Amino acid sequence: MQNATIDQLPVSWQEQLPLCWREQLKEEWSKPYMQQLLIFLKQEYKEHTVYPEENCVFSALRSTPFDQVRVVILGQDPYPGKGQAHGLSFSVPEGQRLPPSLINIFRELKTDLGIENHKGCLQSWANQGILLLNTVLTVRAGEPFSHAGKGWELFTDAIVTKLIQERTHIIFVLWGAAARKKCELLFNSKHQHAVLSSPHPSPLAAHRGFFGCSHFSKINYLLNKLNKPMINWKLP
């Protein structure tokens, strides 16, 4: 796979990448890091259990087209437990037990806006223009951060950079160190975007400033100022 192109991705992945995002990211596929990432992923999926399933790796991009992104919520890497990861940051499929970070997200949402959610699938948020993007898009089962440093960070950097350069008035929500690291891209940008930052909602960090951040009401305040529809945070 020395001259990797998008056509050499597994078919299920290619089908999950919408044409709008494929066009925006077309230059990434011939870069050396992508060639190495594809080789690594091919081997990982062959020899280990990897999450999410291949047809869900690009679920965030599939769910929120490039020209419809209004908010970006950056996560870290997918949940490493069986059945949890489905390609949207912080989200779990219907019927899955809520992970601790998502419990804390819902706790803050209730404190902020009085909204209670009990199901963990955030698909309706994605459908409203929230790009639920992890910094790293795959993980080996039971091994958090096992796919960090393999190339995904460069790919998601490219996603964020494209949004910064080609779009205006996007709200970037940065929870945790990995997300804040990407904020360096924003600080170097002269384009008009908003940034909301806090510690990660995990139990280890939430009490350091995630609780009380009021990001959900702040997002809707900013959207309202831009005459854009506000987010309905209540899950169906």
From Swiss-Prot:
Positions annotated as active site in the UniProt record: 77
Root EC class: hydrolase
Subcellular location: Cytoplasm
Catalysis performed (reactions): Hydrolyzes single-stranded DNA or mismatched double-stranded DNA and polynucleotides, releasing free uracil
Source domain of life: Bacteria
Cellular component, GO annotation: cytoplasm
Keyword match DNA damage: yes
One term of GO molecular function: uracil DNA N-glycosylase activity
InterPro entries, A to Z: UDG_fam1 (IPR002043), Ura-DNA_Glyclase_AS (IPR018085), Uracil-DNA_glycosylase-like (IPR005122), Uracil-DNA_glycosylase-like_sf (IPR036895)
Transmembrane segments: none
GO biological process assignments: base-excision repair, AP site formation via deaminated base removal
EC number: 3.2.2.27
Primary localization class, coarse: cytoplasm
Key words, A-Z: Cytoplasm, DNA damage, DNA repair, Hydrolase
Matching Pfam families: UDG
Coiled-coil intervals, chain numbering: none
Keyword flag Cytoplasm: yes
Family: Belongs to the uracil-DNA glycosylase (UDG) superfamily. UNG family.
Protein's job: Excises uracil residues from the DNA which can arise as a result of misincorporation of dUMP residues by DNA polymerase or due to deamination of cytosine.
Name assigned to this protein: Uracil-DNA glycosylase
Organism: Chlamydia pneumoniae (Chlamydophila pneumoniae)
